[in-house]
């Protein structure tokens, strides 16, 4: 095998004619055993190498090469002690191997290096390849599998963090849209898309939320992953939505960006309040009961449905008659507001002199609870 290395059989042949053959053979075996724990075991002034050093490197994690032999790491081992104590016997099972092999380094030529760089540019998330072409094809990704680490995802593909659309699936039957929106936080919504079961009850099945800005969507996603976000006692699982890059979606994205850049307070909610047109009450009729003004909710809803589907109309506690109108889309509220301010229009002639209309705060425009 190696130079100056003698096995037990060779020792027997070398000292065949000696009278102390048994003693020398035993001495050779003892030296072979204790050489595992000695760093400088020698025979005739030469250091033993080969299998013994490899075994010591395996046990004690010492480096003897650059190609995989240093990939073993001892846990709870003491190199300076030759024998293990009783309390260390259980530690023998803690030896573990970090990797199968670290491998050796080999230089790569220019052509293969270009191929490597091209492969790195492809997006990987959690060890799985995600095709770039599927990002804007309307695919829904769960938060746990696609955007777990924002810093990692942002460094590889910033488009993943730019989405502001979140889907809530498997909503319990009998749950209304108002109950879902009352638990949503993070910021104002640009629009809402509702999916219902094809049954006579028309129960709610799925809701797509489009936030007005990206930060609000990210904040709500982190909040929805906690146990705090529950709808009627059921924790819903949010998922990201990536839209198709169609002309309609691009135009909506540009309109939302203009709203954010102008820094105007715009929401999908309109506050409609009765103006004070009656005279101040006299002392003679102070004791009389205050008369309530009549309002036709169906007529009000019909007038504003011309600009978009109305989600709900709710009363507001006020000294004067006041209601809030929530649309499914923020563009519907913007069209209604423009119609109200335009002279000669239908809303202007009917509501401008007797009603005051302005943008109200969205019910979802609340900060999320930071944990």
From Swiss-Prot:
<dbReference type="GO" id="GO:0030437">
    <property type="term" value="P:ascospore formation"/>
</dbReference>
<comment type="function">
    <text>Essential for sporulation and seems to have a role at the time of, or after, initiation of nuclear division. Appears to have a role in outer spore wall formation.</text>
</comment>
<dbReference type="GO" id="GO:0005634">
    <property type="term" value="C:nucleus"/>
</dbReference>
<dbReference type="GO" id="GO:0005628">
    <property type="term" value="C:prospore membrane"/>
</dbReference>
<keyword id="KW-0749">Sporulation</keyword>
<dbReference type="GO" id="GO:0005619">
    <property type="term" value="C:ascospore wall"/>
</dbReference>
<dbReference type="InterPro" id="IPR035979">
    <property type="entry name" value="RBD_domain_sf"/>
</dbReference>
<dbReference type="GO" id="GO:0030476">
    <property type="term" value="P:ascospore wall assembly"/>
</dbReference>
<dbReference type="GO" id="GO:0030295">
    <property type="term" value="F:protein kinase activator activity"/>
</dbReference>
<dbReference type="InterPro" id="IPR012677">
    <property type="entry name" value="Nucleotide-bd_a/b_plait_sf"/>
</dbReference>
<dbReference type="GO" id="GO:0003676">
    <property type="term" value="F:nucleic acid binding"/>
</dbReference>
<protein>
    <recommendedName>
        <fullName>Sporulation-specific protein 2</fullName>
    </recommendedName>
</protein>
């Amino acid at each position: 095998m190696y130079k100056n290395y003698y096995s037990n059989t060779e020792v027997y042949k070398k000292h065949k004619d000696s009278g102390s053959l048994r003693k020398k053979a035993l001495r050779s075996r003892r030296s072979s055993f204790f050489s595992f724990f000695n760093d400088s075991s020698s025979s005739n002034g030469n250091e033993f190498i080969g299998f013994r050093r490899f075994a010591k490197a395996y046990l004690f994690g010492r480096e003897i090469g650059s190609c995989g032999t240093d990939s073993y790491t001892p846990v709870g081992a003491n190199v300076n002690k030759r024998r293990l104590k009783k309390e260390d016997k259980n530690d023998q099972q803690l030896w573990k191997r970090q990797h199968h092999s670290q491998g050796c380094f080999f230089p790569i030529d220019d052509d293969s290096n270009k191929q490597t760089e091209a492969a790195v540019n492809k997006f990987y998330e959690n060890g799985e390849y995600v095709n770039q072409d599927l990002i804007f094809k309307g695919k829904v990704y769960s938060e746990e599998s696609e955007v777990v680490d924002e810093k990692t995802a942002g460094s590889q593909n910033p488009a993943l963090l730019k989405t502001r659309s979140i889907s809530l699936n498997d909503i319990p039957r009998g749950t209304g849209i108002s109950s879902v929106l009352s638990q949503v936080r993070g910021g104002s919504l640009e629009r809402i898309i509702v999916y219902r079961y094809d049954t006579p009850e028309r129960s709610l099945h799925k809701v797509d939320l489009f936030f007005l800005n990206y930060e609000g969507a990210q904040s709500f996603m982190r909040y929805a992953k906690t146990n705090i976000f529950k709808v009627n006692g059921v924790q819903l699982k949010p998922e990201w939505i990536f839209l198709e890059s169609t002309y309609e979606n691009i135009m909506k994205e540009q309109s939302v960006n203009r709203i954010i850049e102008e820094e105007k307070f715009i929401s999908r909610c309109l506050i409609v309040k009765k103006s004070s047109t009656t005279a101040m009450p006299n002392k003679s009729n102070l004791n009389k009961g205050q008369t309530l003004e009549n309002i036709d909710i169906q007529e009000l809803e019909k007038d504003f449905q011309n600009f978009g589907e109305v989600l709900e109309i709710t009363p507001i506690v006020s000294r004067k008659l006041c209601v809030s109108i929530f649309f499914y889309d923020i563009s519907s509220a913007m069209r209604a507001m423009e119609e109200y301010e335009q002279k000669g229009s239908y809303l202007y002639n009917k509501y401008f002199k007797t009603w005051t209309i302005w943008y109200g705060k969205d019910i979802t425009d609340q900060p999320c609870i930071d944990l």
